[in-house]
Structures are given as C-alpha cells and as structure tokens.
Regions:
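Membrane-embedded alpha-helical bundles that constitute the cytochrome b-like, heme-associated redox core
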Residues: 1-237
Length: 237
C-alpha cells in the first residue's frame, strides 16, 4: 500500500480535471439509494418484502462490482491509490480536524479506509439477508439451507449490523459536512460531476465505460445465479 496523491493548490496552476469516473459515481449514488430504499421498505411492512429483497440483491451486485473495480478500474478508483499503511493513516489524523485544506485527488487516508469499512458492513448486511426469514411469508433464498441456529445468528447480525451502518452513515455525512464547510473541499460536487481542481497529470483520461459495463453485467449475473441456484425450502408441518 502507498500514500495517496495530493497537491497544494498554491503554485500548481490547478484546473478542473476528471478524477472520479462515472461508474464509480454511479456506484456511489446507486448504493446510497439502494440502502435508503431497503431501509424504507424494511419499515414499510410485509407487502414491501419482495422489493426489500430485490434491493438487497442490487446492493450485492453493486458491492461486488466496486470490489472488482477497486482492482481493475481507473486510477483513483483503485484500492492501491488510496489505501495507506496504518502508520501513514495514524500520522494523517492530526490533519483531519485542521482547517488547513490538503486536497487529495482521490480519497484521502481516512476516506480510503472509511470506504473499505462501509463496503464491508454493507456486504455483511446484504449477505446475512440471504439467510433470514420474517417468519410469516418471506424467506431469504438460503434460509432453508442452514440450521435454525445459523438462521437466528444471521437474523441477529442483520439487525445489529444495521444499527452500525446507521452510525457509519451519520459519521460519513458529518465528515462530508466538515470537509465541505470546514475545510472548503467540494466533495459532493466532485462525486456528482467527477471533477476536481488539480494538475492535469493527475486526472484520468476516460471512464473505461465498456469495461465497467461488462464487469457490472457479470456481477449482476453472478448474484442472479446465486439466488436462482438456492435450493427449494423444505417445510415441515
């Protein structure tokens, strides 16, 4: 792992360059909407259970895509561009609450590890949902494939992990607000439009659209296949 790329606004003659490819941006907002939708449908009642499950499958497809894109995607989307060593991460913390603006073209050290953490907890949430039941009408596709003890563990994990996700989302939004207004870094605009100010040499030339669409199609197909291959539940009356 190596340190993230940053630049000093002064003396670098910055101009707007493409940093975030559109597949990364589409992933970000699609994941946010899928999570919001899954939260709403979970609270809305049993009649929304099918939609809730579909959104879970969508989240799995998106997360699998982002993991693969983190290895073969564009420059700043790759994990290798923003995951730093623990030593570098700890040494960067003293700048986190400083108003001094040190722009990173991609994720900074804290943002990089926060990205991995959020992906991880959402992955746990989506996977655990495959094994649980509402005990009335709807079962996850693999609920009948595990013992009652495992299903109960997955259900508890699903509900407890959701509370952790809410805490991380609140922390994430607070951090964005701090960087936006306290450190004067337009992170939301960058994730919407894909552009930041910096030296042209640090920008990306394209979003690698064909590669991204191929990978996402493969990921969605894999998740569909996993669900389709789930064994039929056996009901004992």
């Amino acid at each position: 792992m190596r340190n993230t790329e940053s630049h000093n606004r002064e003396g670098s003659n910055p101009k707007e360059i493409l940093v975030w490819d559109w597949p990364t941006r589409a992933f970000h907002w699609s994941l946010a909407l899928s999570f919001l939708g899954s939260w709403i449908t979970a609270e809305a009642g049993l009649e929304w259970a099918s939609t809730h499950m579909f959104l879970g499958y969508m989240m799995l497809s998106l997360l699998l895509f982002r993991i693969l894109w983190g290895f073969v995607g564009t420059r700043h989307a790759k994990f290798s561009s923003f995951l730093v060593s623990p030593r570098v991460f700890l040494s960067s913390l003293h700048n986190l609450f400083s108003r001094r603006s040190e722009d990173h073209m991609g994720h900074g050290p804290s943002g990089g590890w926060a990205t991995v953490l959020i992906i991880s907890v959402l992955l746990v949430q989506a996977i655990s949902g495959l094994f649980i039941s509402d005990d009335i009408f709807n079962d996850g596709p693999y609920h009948g494939s595990v013992s009652d003890g495992v299903a109960s563990f997955m259900a508890n994990l699903h509900h407890l992990n959701f509370n952790l996700i809410l805490c991380l989302v609140a922390l994430h939004l607070s951090a964005i607000g701090w960087f936006q207004f306290g450190k004067n870094q337009a992170l939301t605009k960058a994730m919407l439009l894909g552009k930041k100010k910096g030296p042209a040499v640090l920008g990306i030339k394209s979003s690698q659209t064909l590669k991204a669409l191929s990978i996402f199609s493969a990921c969605a197909s894999i998740i569909w296949l996993i669900v389709w291959l789930a064994p039929e539940p056996v009901y004992l009356f």
